[in-house]
Regions:
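N-terminal glycine-rich FAD/FM-binding segment characteristic of electron-transfer flavoproteins
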Residues: 1-260
Length: 263
């Protein structure tokens, strides 16, 4: 029996998944809030950040200062460290309860795991690794015999190995979901004292056979930078020829305030 189509008019608001690791918000969370504010302005709606974790409520303050209008906090010991199943259950519960029109997730290691899992469970589409998001008509150019729908999320991403650019829409299902590449969108200036409405939501997280147990976490120690935060990279490989020549690249990176990477 065919499932009834969802009432698209029930879905409102631009939501973002506010990634945090070790109770520290990732930069992508602020970038998504910045882009969400632009989209929300076009739709005359609000921006809601979804914050999942354990003892993370205090992070809602910073999300408000960067532009979020509301923060939904799901605080549960099962969410202390990222695991696919409990995080997917939590985000699916938020979507089913609050019905966002748009749901944005960072295209990080976590987001690339969480986003597709959630989109499959709520039976909607997801466009991955987006580099541009805007509100517009779909089809972009009116076509005879085909309805042109307005106020759609147009999601642009590289395709076919980067040889072409595709613009994708999800006109018949909600939420419209996308993962967004870090470093592409701009975060807004921090507005000290700006407060978001904080909503505490506590869905039941059911342990099942998809749960995994984290036995241990070993964190690397050293002066290793996160290249996702870098504007410029100096990279060297086998072609450098020797350890001595590689030091020249290290010197270049140090004087130009860039990061040195290996391919």
């Amino acid at each position: 029996m065919e499932e009834p189509k969802m009432g698209l008019e029930e879905y409102k608001g631009v939501y973002i998944y506010a990634q945090q690791v070790d109770n520290k918000l990732s930069n992508i969370a602020f970038e998504l809030v910045g882009k969400a504010k632009e989209l929300a302005a076009d739709l005359n709606t609000e921006v809601t950040a979804v914050l999942l974790g354990s003892n993370v409520k205090a992070l809602a303050t910073e999300l408000g200062e960067y532009g979020a209008d509301k923060v939904i906090v799901v605080d549960n010991p099962a969410l202390e460290t990222y695991r696919t199943e409990p995080y997917a259950q939590a985000l699916v519960s938020v979507i089913n309860e609050y019905k966002p029109e748009i749901m944005l997730v960072g295209a990080t290691a976590i987001g690339r795991d969480l986003g597709p899992t959630v989109s499959a469970r709520v039976k909607t589409g997801l466009t991955a690794d987006c580099t541009k998001l805007e509100i517009g008509d779909f089809p972009i150019n009116a076509m005879p015999g085909q309805e042109q729908k307005h106020n759609q999320l147009l999601m642009t991403r590289p395709a076919f190995g980067g040889n072409t650019i595709a613009t994708i829409a999800c006109p018949d299902n909600r939420p419209q979901m996308a993962t967004v590449r870090p470093g592409v969108m701009q975060k807004l200036p921090k507005e000290a004292g700006r407060a978001a409405e904080v909503i505490e939501f506590n869905p039941t997280l059911e342990e099942n056979n998809r749960y995994v147990e984290i036995m241990d976490i070993v964190k690397a120690v050293g002066n290793v930078e996160n290249i996702m935060d870098a504007k410029v990279l100096v990279s060297g490989g086998r072609g450098v020829g020797s350890a001595e020549n590689f030091e020249m690249l290290r010197d270049l990176a140090s004087v130009s305030y860039t990061h040195l990477t290996l391919p």
